């Protein structure tokens, strides 16, 4: 039985104790059934985030943690034949499903997929117009979150946009959120993510917040759109 992590102070974001290898193996294992488990609840939130990002034809866009590729299909359609979409995921199993979905939709040539860790993005500085993350940032350990956002800031061009959809610790949690955190704390291999402060993390990383919305899935969700500042950002 997995050992429980220490009880956090009120308002403290829980740590992630599952290793990257364990996370990769978990998502490889569930890649072919992930949509059955999560798409019904995550899909509407993800689409709200894509609407806020408002990708335009010709843009270069990265999705971190694209999973089975539903957002990649939407992004590929949005950038058109003159744009480019990149997808980076820790799980090769998820990327294989995403590639199959892209081929089925006829957009595989517009999307470049790579297995990797967002702590070290394999893209040139100031090379991307926009970044999208949906239910991904909360998978990183607490000290890693600012590192991931710093990498996002590095690869975005000045004025570039980032939209993040994530399980939120903002505001009153209620029973469901407390139960979510309890499960993560006591069974980290079963529930590998936990609520985080999405907007606050992005502000701390130096992004200019353009909009922030809080919605209810079965847990609270933040949908935040931000921009890398033109000067000094």
Role assignments for model-derived ranges:
Residues 1-31:
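N-terminal, positively charged/glycine-rich alpha-helical extensions of SAM-dependent methyltransferases
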Residues 40-57:
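Conserved alpha-helix/loop element of class I SAM-dependent methyltransferases that forms part
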Residues 62-120:
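Class I SAM-dependent methyltransferase SAM/SAH-binding core
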Residues 119-130:
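A short acidic, Gly/Pro-enriched loop at the edge of an enzyme's catalytic core
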Residues 146-158:
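A short glycine-rich, Lys/Arg-flanked "PGG" loop and its adjoining helix->strand segment in the class I
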Residues 159-166:
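Conserved beta-strand signature within the Rossmann-like core of class I S-adenosyl-L-methionine
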Residues 190-206:
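Short alpha-helix
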Residues 206-233:
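Core SAM-dependent methyltransferase catalytic element
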């Amino acid at each position: 039985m997995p050992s429980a992590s220490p009880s956090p102070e009120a308002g403290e974001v829980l740590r992630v104790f599952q290793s990257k290898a364990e996370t990769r193996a978990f998502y490889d294992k569930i890649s072919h059934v992930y949509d059955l488990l999560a798409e019904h609840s995550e899909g509407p939130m993800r689409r709200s985030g894509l609407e806020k990002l408002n990708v335009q034809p010709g843009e270069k866009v990265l999705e971190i943690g694209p999973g089975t590729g539903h957002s990649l299909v939407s992004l590929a359609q949005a950038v058109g034949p003159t744009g480019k979409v990149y997808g980076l995921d820790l799980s090769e199993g998820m990327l294989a499903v995403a590639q199959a979905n892209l081929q089925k939709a006829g957009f595989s040539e517009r999307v470049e997929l790579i297995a990797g860790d967002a702590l070290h993005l394999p893209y040139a500085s100031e090379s991307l117009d926009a970044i999208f993350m949906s239910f991904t940032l909360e998978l990183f350990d607490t000290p890693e979150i600012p590192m991931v956002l710093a990498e996002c800031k590095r690869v975005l061009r000045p004025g570039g946009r980032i939209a993040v959809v994530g399980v939120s610790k903002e505001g009153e949690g209620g029973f469901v959120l407390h139960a979510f955190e309890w499960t993560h704390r006591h069974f980290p291999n079963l529930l590998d993510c936990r609520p985080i402060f999405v907007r606050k993390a992005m502000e701390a990383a130096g992004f200019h917040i353009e909009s922030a919305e809080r919605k209810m899935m079965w847990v609270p969700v933040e949908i935040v759109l931000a921009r890398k500042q033109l000067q000094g950002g």
